[in-house]
UniProtKB/Swiss-Prot annotation:
Belongs to the TrpB family. The keyword Amino-acid biosynthesis applies. It catalyses: (1S,2R)-1-C-(indol-3-yl)glycerol 3-phosphate + L-serine = D-glyceraldehyde 3-phosphate + L-tryptophan + H2O. Tetramer of two alpha and two beta chains. The gene is trpB. Its cofactor is pyridoxal 5'-phosphate. The modification N6-(pyridoxal phosphate)lysine is found at residue 88. It is an enzyme of class 4 (lyase). The beta subunit is responsible for the synthesis of L-tryptophan from indole and L-serine. Keywords: Amino-acid biosynthesis, Aromatic amino acid biosynthesis, Lyase, Pyridoxal phosphate, Tryptophan biosynthesis. This is Tryptophan synthase beta chain.
Length: 397
């Protein structure tokens, strides 16, 4: 692996643990990415799509009501306002442009909440690429509005009936397809995880989130935030937010994993703090595994956080103490979901609700503390309203 152009590791985490047949494919992808990053024409086309199709920059919104009676200022980075409804659209546009540059004629992707699938479908429709999306059968059921959106935009959605019928199984099927069709096909991985160079590519195609946030907060407040908070599943929205703040040592970075029904129940999706290091999905990173190394089922009310591993850069930031990683239960996330809707008129995705819940916890712990917090509101909650209605009111799913 010494002949890669970019460092494939973050400390001990990362790497390229894939079938031999895919090694040259990943190296070709890395080469194309490095060239594209240095090509002003590629960068201009990407920037144009982000601005005039996706709707960047997204707003930075001050919460006027949630912090009443406290000395906290809480801002939300509004990735929910991006075309497609979540941060996923950013890097999807970048990767499809890259795939076209490489002469690929077909896109495949995996999706959990369906947001990455929707982003892939809309970008493929606009950039005229055929698209197949693998999705766990369980997720197809709980995210039916997104399945309909994908099919409406011309994507072929394949429900995966294997294993736990969730995101990890969709990832495995997508990998299988790619191994068989890599000459014509680009695997558009949806998070900052997987084999090198994906964690680096996804970070670079998401880092405008943090770059914009930094500019906007300086403009609004004249200083950097004390704390930046983002939800962590695979970790793309969080690394996109954190990347531009990593060198700002006075800014605390907090990643929020899903505690599900409670860490002690085993039904959670918090491998970073409660898993062990192993090899999964083409990388070395913390994973939820039993003593025999078998991957355990992750669980979260939020389909997009229901993943048994985490991106290698998050593992590294945790190890060196640059970022803190905490967890929030389903119940806490549901409460935050309702609070934001009720008090600010914004319905957040259940993924983003985990980050918001931790921010509200921080505020509650110390209402007299003068602090400036930014939460990455990574997506909107339209896709989750039936799930939440069912839990709160026994409504139809």
């Amino acid at each position: 692996m010494s002949d890669t152009l970019l460092n494939p590791y973050f400390g001990e985490f990362g790497g390229m643990y894939v079938p031999e047949i895919l090694v040259p494919v990943l190296k070709q992808l890395e080469q194309a990415f490095v060239e594209a990053q240095n090509d002003p024409t590629f960068q201009a086309e990407f920037a144009d799509l982000l601005k005039n199709y996706a709707g960047r920059p997204t707003a930075l919104t001050l919460c006027r009501n949630l912090t009443k009676g406290t000395k906290t200022k809480l801002y939300l980075k509004r990735e929910d306002l991006l075309h497609g409804g979540a941060h996923k659209t950013n890097q999807v546009l970048g990767q499809i442009l890259l795939a076209k540059r490489m002469g690929k004629t077909r896109i495949i992707a995996e999706t959990g909440a369906g947001q990455h699938g929707v982003a892939t479908a809309l970008a493929c429709a606009m950039l005229d690429m055929p698209c197949r999306v693998y999705m766990g059968a369980k997720d197809v059921e709980r995210q039916s509005p997104n399945v309909f959106r994908m099919r409406l935009m011309g994507a072929e959605v394949i429900p995966v009936q294997k294993g736990s019928c969730s995101l990890k199984d969709a990832c495995c099927e997508a990998m299988r397809d790619w191994s068989a069709n890599y000459e014509t096909t680009h695997y558009l991985l949806g998070t900052a995880a997987g084999p090198h160079p994906f964690p680096t590519i996804v970070r670079e195609f998401q880092k405008m989130i943090g770059e914009e946030t930094k500019r906007q907060i300086l403009e609004r407040e004249g200083r950097l935030p004390d704390t930046v908070i983002a939800a962590v599943g695979g970790g793309s929205n969080a690394i996109g937010m954190f990347a531009d703040f990593i060198d700002e040592s006075n800014v605390r970075l907090i990643g929020v994993e899903p505690a599900g029904k409670g860490i002690e129940t085993g039904e959670h999706g918090a491998p970073l703090k409660h898993g062990t290091t192993g090899i999964y999905f083409g990388m070395k990173s913390p994973i939820m595994q039993d003593k025999d190394g078998q991957i355990e089922e992750s669980y979260s009310i939020s389909a997009g956080l229901d993943f048994p591993s985490v991106g290698p850069q998050h593992a590294y930031l945790n190890e060196i103490g640059r970022a803190d990683y905490v967890s929030i239960t389903d119940e806490e996330a549901l409460n935050a979901f309702q609070e934001l809707a009720k008090h600010e008129g914004i319905i957040p995705a259940l993924e983003s609700s985990h980050a918001l819940a931790y921010a509200l916890k921080l505020i509650k712990q110390n209402p007299e503390k003068e602090q400036l917090l930014v939460v990455n509101l990574s997506g909107r909650g339209d896709k989750d309203i039936f799930t939440v209605d069912k839990i709160l009111n026994g409504g139809a799913n």
